[in-house]
């Protein structure tokens, strides 16, 4: 038997049978991808891949506590299972007691499709999309612009089984589309991205029309110095900032005084008001169009995850409600340390509570300000304030009297997303969006455009 023919549920059952540890968690991730790439108004490559990753988590009880060992391998066959299990057990025996040790999760009903074959994607996912893309190539060519980009679709079937009796399964589709339009001399560039589950809700013609309009705006070039400007952040930029904020919202780190969510004098800022706008930042594994695993899948332990929590059911969670900080990410272990509720990370993020205004309507209501396309190369400067730095990219536009006057130079920015929430004066209509910076790791987001009266453009950037 090979990794291509072994049934995943049989693999995880056989792995559990081989275990000699006091506890065992097995995670099989069956993944398949299909992709298209293009450049200069022509397809360049396409392909389909398939693979498997098997993770074994062994737990060993001792006088001083329970230790854990984690080993992951790709393309594992039935004949290689025992060596994988022994390696995880050896890692557990060689480790000290796990700080986050807890009893393995029990009492979660078995997934009814646990023994079914894994879901798989194929090039058929592009059946309607590819011809529409070809038509966009023709329009772009006639309009004197070049289209570059890629479309990627992934399906991951996760099988999670434990010695405590859990048998869980989740199928996760994930699609991304990134389209970049350039002028023939490459001096003007515009970007648009979309997140999708099946490529049935993306329209390359509409995206190309949007990019053509932006390239037209860029025909007039305006140089501006660094400074603080009223700025309209589109949903993709808001997503990039708030995803990083979520990744920095571990309850334990905050309680220990190490993050922006630490309260001066001790404790956390849970209960404090972060924004005067009635904004709610939330996650929900059952959010329509942004569905994600309804249980914890942890391949390793860290500040915001614990391998002992694998299989723990996930529920809709409000991180910020009506502008007030309500929850930080907490495992069972960190919840016990901080006295906060158990609120594990969830694989999507939604910000709502703004008006029904579109970004275009917000532009029309701007006397003078900047309109961004997206952010890039975001890095943390100071965890205590969550100060981030990064670059604007693929189009920054000056808005005057409700209309785009032209394209300005790019900037480096220095801002904290927490501070931005506090200074924001308007949020518009929430819509699904693709974060540009974090799209390799996090794609399921819905955000509104946000108006900030004094966004800090700290220096001029020479990037396009």
PLM ranges: what are they?
Residues 110, 266-464:
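Dual-mode signal for accessory low-complexity, basic/Gly-rich regions
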Residues 1-306, 321-322, 347, 403, ...:
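Active-site bordering "gate/hinge" segments
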């Amino acid at each position: 038997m090979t990794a291509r023919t072994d049934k995943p549920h049989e693999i995880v059952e056989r792995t559990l049978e081989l275990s000699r540890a006091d506890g065992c968690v097995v995670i099989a991730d069956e993944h398949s991808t299909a992709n298209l790439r293009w450049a200069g108004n022509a397809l360049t490559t396409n392909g389909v891949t398939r693979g498997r990753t098997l993770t074994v988590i062994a737990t060993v009880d001792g006088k001083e506590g329970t230790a854990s060992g984690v080993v992951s391998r790709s393309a594992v066959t039935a004949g290689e299972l025992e060596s994988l299990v022994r390696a995880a057990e050896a890692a557990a025996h060689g480790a000290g007691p796990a700080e986050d040790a807890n009893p393995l999760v029990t009492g979660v009903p078995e997934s009814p499709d646990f023994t079914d074959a894994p879901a798989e994607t194929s090039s058929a996912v592009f059946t309607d999309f590819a011809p529409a893309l070809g038509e966009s190539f023709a329009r772009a060519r006639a309009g004197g612009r070049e289209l570059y980009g890629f479309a990627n679709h992934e399906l991951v079937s996760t099988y999670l089984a434990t010695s405590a009796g859990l048998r869980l399964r989740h199928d996760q589709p994930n699609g991304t589309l990134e389209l970049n339009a350039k002028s023939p001399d490459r001096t003007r560039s515009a970007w648009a991205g979309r997140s999708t589950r099946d490529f049935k809700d993306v329209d390359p013609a509409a995206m190309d029309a949007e990019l053509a309009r932006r390239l037209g705006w860029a025909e007039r070039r305006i140089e501006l110095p660094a400074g603080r400007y009223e700025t309209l952040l589109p949903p993709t930029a808001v997503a990039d900032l708030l995803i990083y904020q979520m990744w920095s919202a571990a309850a334990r780190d905050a309680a220990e005084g190490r993050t922006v969510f630490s309260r001066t004098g001790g404790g956390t800022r849970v209960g404090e008001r972060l924004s005067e706008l009635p904004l709610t930042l939330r996650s929900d594994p059952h959010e329509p169009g942004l569905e994600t695993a309804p249980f914890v899948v942890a391949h390793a332990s860290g500040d915001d995850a614990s391998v002992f929590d694998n299989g723990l059911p996930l529920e809709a969670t409000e991180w910020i409600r009506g502008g007030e900080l309500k929850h930080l990410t907490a495992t069972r272990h960190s919840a016990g340390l901080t006295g906060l509720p158990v609120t594990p990370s969830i694989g999507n993020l939604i910000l709502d509570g703004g008006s029904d205004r579109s970004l275009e309507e917000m532009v029309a209501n701007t006397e003078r300000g900047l309109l961004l396309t997206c952010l890039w190369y975001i890095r943390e400067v100071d965890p205590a304030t969550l100060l981030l730095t990064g670059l604007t990219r693929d189009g920054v536009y000056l808005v005057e009297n409700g209309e785009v006057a032209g394209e300005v130079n790019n900037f480096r920015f220095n801002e904290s997303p927490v501070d931005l929430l506090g200074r924001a004066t308007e949020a518009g209509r929430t819509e699904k969006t693709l974060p540009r910076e974090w799209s390799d790791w996090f794609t399921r987001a819905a955000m509104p455009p946000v108006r900030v009266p004094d966004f800090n453009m700290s220096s001029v950037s020479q990037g396009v």
